[in-house]
Amino acid sequence: MAVASVAAALLAALGGALWLAARRFSGPRNQRQQGGGDPGLMHGKTVLITGANSGLGRATAAELLRLGARVIMGCRDRARAEEAAGQLRQELCQAGGAGPDGTDGQLVVKELDLASLRSVRAFCQELLQEEPRLDVLINNAGVFHCPYTKTEDGFEMQFGVNHLGHFLLTNLLLGLLKSSAPSRIVVVSSKLYKYGEINFEDLNSEQSYNKSFCYSRSKLANILFTRELARRLEGTNVTVNVLHPGIVRTNLGRHIHIPLLARPLFNLVSWAFFKTPLEGAQTSIYLACSPDVEGVSGRYFGDCKEEELLPKAMDESVARKLWDISEVMVGILK
């Protein structure tokens, strides 16, 4: 009897997932929401996207390329990035956009390892020498739920890549962003920031390590960084906003262990419930190019709309302290 009940429950769950999947498949799919626009909207604009070879970053790059932007893909694995760039050029050509030679929207691949401050500095030095302007910086790359490892500089990996690497990158490019104004900075965070806390006594997780907590902490740091940066950029005509993309089907969760027998059901449920990368990228695209947010800075967005933050994400004293400590950690000298 117990076995029959379990089997019935599993069949019911599977049937429900199939029904939802069918609804998702047959219902209207608004792939391009408010973040979309006409080809040419970003013509003449240079956009840097970190982690642009897969997932949200790739979808963001594809759409901004379609809109006519010159897109710089800052990626850790150059070979994979070159492969993705080739696919994006071909897709754009097939869709009737720019030709394979990139005469309208352009793609440039550059190596950038956010787990290495040396790599970040080398990347910025090269970019500052080669690029006369930078209109949009999208801090998209990230790691999630990885086992305890450290960056090249000895930082806990999730905090080091998700926060510190982008902190240094942004600071080194601020001069170019200011000279290119009006310009925008877009920071990709997560709703999971709600479960994070900034423990200044153990930012490197030497005392204890929890994958989920450390990811949430890094995403909370993204928001605090955005709000403090917005305060510092007042009057410069450079804006910075932060977003959550929702739950998206990407390879970001590759470190999450799912039992073998549960994988088919998980894959089906994720297909039914999770956003596609293009759907998840809409808020990044919206903040990068929409006239609706011109002059808007220091705000938190989801689904192309402003959302409220928990008080801990708006704590100005914590944001300032995190900024000061981050400057020391990455070696920025005043």
Swiss-Prot record:
The keyword Transmembrane does not apply. One of its GO terms (cellular component) is mitochondrion. SUPFAM superfamilies: NAD(P)-binding Rossmann-fold domains. It catalyses: all-trans-retinol + NADP(+) = all-trans-retinal + NADPH + H(+); 11-cis-retinol + NADP(+) = 11-cis-retinal + NADPH + H(+); 9-cis-retinol + NADP(+) = 9-cis-retinal + NADPH + H(+). It is an enzyme of class 1 (oxidoreductase). Its EC number is 1.1.1.300. Substrate binds at residue 190. The active site is at residue 215. Gene3D superfamilies: NAD(P)-binding Rossmann-like Domain. Keywords: Lipid metabolism, NADP, Oxidoreductase. The keyword Amino-acid biosynthesis does not apply. NADP(+) binds at residues 51-57. GO terms for biological process: retinol metabolic process. One of its GO terms (molecular function) is alcohol dehydrogenase (NADP+) activity. Pfam families: adh_short. Retinol dehydrogenase with a clear preference for NADP. Displays high activity towards 9-cis, 11-cis and all-trans-retinol. Shows a very weak activity towards 13-cis-retinol. Has no activity towards steroids. Shows clear specificity for the pro-S hydrogen on C4 of NADPH and the pro-R hydrogen on C15 of retinols. Belongs to the short-chain dehydrogenases/reductases (SDR) family. This is Retinol dehydrogenase 14. The lineage of its organism: Eukaryota, Metazoa, Chordata, Craniata, Vertebrata.
